């Protein structure tokens, strides 16, 4: 077989579980080894893996802001950011290799179920700007949300801005006004979970959470594939 990440050839080892689930292994041993699942202890707010269960530096900064203390309940992520996930994210996010998303379906569902206990949550993928969506042809956050198996709504509209990756960290951390909202009735008094590919400083998630809370959401949490 050919590994879907490194594209190297390998001999697959089938198990009764993989046969019954019709979920054959499509990753080589080396790539599996470098998939770094986030394990406790973690930051209780953003889910970053660390040596203790106290708030990390970024989350401490968010808690100091009066407009952010009650906006986001928590974030949880599946994998830590490393060289392998950098390559995966690039292929998935920028080259449209959406088949990679299916590789993570089992882990995504397991971590989501373990992290969120509310009944009938609404998933809201972080949107792309119209320009970015036209350029890529798909929104990776919508694809990730579809793996979870809960209702999906798309009431947020991204306002075109310069790329987050080109901004300094303090500029990203304190940015506002990235989104507008439509169709607010569907989220009033609902538990909302934002879905995105990666959580970095939290600026994108917090800004989306703020506007959803202002529109009447009961609570807002977030779930990402990767925590950097």
Where are each of the predicted segments found?
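Glycine-rich phosphate/pyrophosphate-handling loop used in enzymes and phosphotransfer proteins
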Residues: 1-228
């Amino acid at each position: 077989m050919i590994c879907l990440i490194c594209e190297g050839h390998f001999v697959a080892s089938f198990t009764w579980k993989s046969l019954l689930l019709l979920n054959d292994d499509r990753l080589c041993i080396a790539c599996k080894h470098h998939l770094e699942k986030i394990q406790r202890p973690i930051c209780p707010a953003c889910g970053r893996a660390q040596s203790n269960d106290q708030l990390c530096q970024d989350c401490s900064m968010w808690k100091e802001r009066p407009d952010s203390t009650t906006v986001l309940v928590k974030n949880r992520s599946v994998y830590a950011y490393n060289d392998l996930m950098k390559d995966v994210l690039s292929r998935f996010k920028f080259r449209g290799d959406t088949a990679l998303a299916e590789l993570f379906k089992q882990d995504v569902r397991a971590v989501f179920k373990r992290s969120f206990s509310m009944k009938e949550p609404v998933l809201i993928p972080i949107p792309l700007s119209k320009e970015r969506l036209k350029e890529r042809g798909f929104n990776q956050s919508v694809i990730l949300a579809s793996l979870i198996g809960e209702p999906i709504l798309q009431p947020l509209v991204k306002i075109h801005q310069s790329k987050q990756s080109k901004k300094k960290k303090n500029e990203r951390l304190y940015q506002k006004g990235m989104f507008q909202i439509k169709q607010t009735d569907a989220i009033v008094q609902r538990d909302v979970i934002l879905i995105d590919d990666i959580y970095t400083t939290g600026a994108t998630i917090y800004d989306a959470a703020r506007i959803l809370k202002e529109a009447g959401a009961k609570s807002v949490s977030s779930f990402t594939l990767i925590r950097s």
